Amino acid sequence: MKLLLQNQNIFQKLKNTLNGCIKKFYDTYQDLEQMQKFEMIVEDKLLFRYSCSQSEMFSAQIQAHYLEKRVLQLTDGNVKYIVNFRDKGVLDKANFFDTPNNSLVIIRQWSYEIYYTKNTFQINLVIDEMRCIDIITTIFYCKLELDFTQGIKGISKSSSFSNQIYEYSAQYYKAIQLLKKLLINDSYISELYNSTKSKQQPRLFIFQSFKPKMNLAEQNLSRQFEQCQQDDFGDGCLLQIVNYTHQSLKQIENKNNSNQIVNGQNEISKKKRVLKSNEDLYKISLQKQLKIFQEEEIELHSQSTIRNQTNQQLETFESDTSKRNSEKILHSINELNTSKQKVNQMNSSQHQIQKLENNNLNKNILNQINENDIKNELEERQQQHLTQSFNSKAQLKKIITLKKNQDILLFKPQEQEGSKKY
């Protein structure tokens, strides 16, 4: 974990304060395994949480919050730890949140949290990045590891500090970005050195807090750091650390190159295995397809045989059917001729019957006509007789009328003779 402090005086005061706190805790609680309560008095109320990422520390999630009595309470599972710092001089209000490893920070305000495993204290330094700078809004988390048997295993600082820290905000921000990039690419070392070379800019130092089991590079860097600590972190120390960091990065790069070669070979072998596996799978697939084709060919041959047999049966059936149809047609023709003869005979008989019926009908008609003629003749004679009788009566009546008129004329007076028109 990378850590950045500002000032030798602050560094010394911080170290003395931590040592005093540890001694106080150790004198008060001889059996550290039984410790369950620490108190921490702070200058301001705060709310934060933290998830421990170090395997040698608490692995459970740690949640902390300030109670009404301004006490910091840490919770790990079912166990609660309340941390208490009696010395308020080094405490200031702070903010806290999760950050990835290798975070580089600039300390301005801070507070502490403490928890332990077995005989080792984990002292966390909670740092508030400068709130007055809009471009820096991130809050970083840094830690100091302490062990009773080996003392302070790692700490770091910057050799300059200014009360006018706001004037250096842009330089601090740029230096932080460069240091972050340094962890990935050593080409920024010269740029970093040039940016820290000027006395008008704050000088930054790289630091690694070490675990109990250090590798060779960590041990060398630890000795280099101790030498720089004796030299009060002068410019020569800065150059030595930068040069050593450059060498370490080269070693890491070479190691990475070797690892890349090995990884490349492993990748090639893996790809060959995958290719071989794919080839085997392809062969199996082709074999399956060939088997399917063979089965389809057998099926097609079977279908062709069945089709030929069906065609033969159809031809035989059609031949038999044609023969049977011819016989049926001849038989039908014969039956038709026979039927025609019967029909002709029936028609002839019917004609004779009809002829007889017509003759009888004609006779009846003639008889009826004769009867009607006779009847009409009788009626006509009767009518003539009646007419003659009527005419005779009318003539007689006329004669009578004429007679009467003559009689009347004969007996009229003489004076009426002048009016006669006869």
Curated annotation (Swiss-Prot):
Annotated transmembrane regions: none
Function description: Tethering component of the holoenzyme telomerase ribonucleoprotein (RNP) complex. Telomerase is an essential ribonucleoprotein enzyme that copies new telomeric repeats onto chromosome ends by repetitively synthesizing the short telomere-repeat sequence 5'-TTGGGG-3' using an RNA template component TER. In the telomerase holoenzyme complex, acts as a hub that anchors the two heterotrimeric subcomplexes with the catalytic core.
Subunit structure: Component of the telomerase holoenzyme complex, composed of the catalytic core (the catalytic subunit TERT, the telomerase RNA template component TER and TAP65/p65), which is associated with two heterotrimeric subcomplexes: (i) the replication protein A (RPA)-related subcomplex, composed of TEB1, RPA2/TEB2 and RPA3/TEB3 and (ii) the CST-like subcomplex, composed of TAP75/p75, TAP45/p45 and TAP19/p19. TEB1 and the CST-like subcomplex are tethered to the catalytic core by TAP50/p50.
Keywords: Chromosome, Telomere
GO cellular component annotations of the record: chromosome, telomeric region; telomerase holoenzyme complex
GO terms classed as biological process: telomere maintenance via telomerase
Superkingdom of the source species: Eukaryota
Gene knockout outcome: Critically short telomeres.
Compartment(s) where it occurs, according to its Swiss-Prot or TrEMBL record: Chromosome, Telomere
Record-given protein name: Telomerase-associated protein of 50 kDa
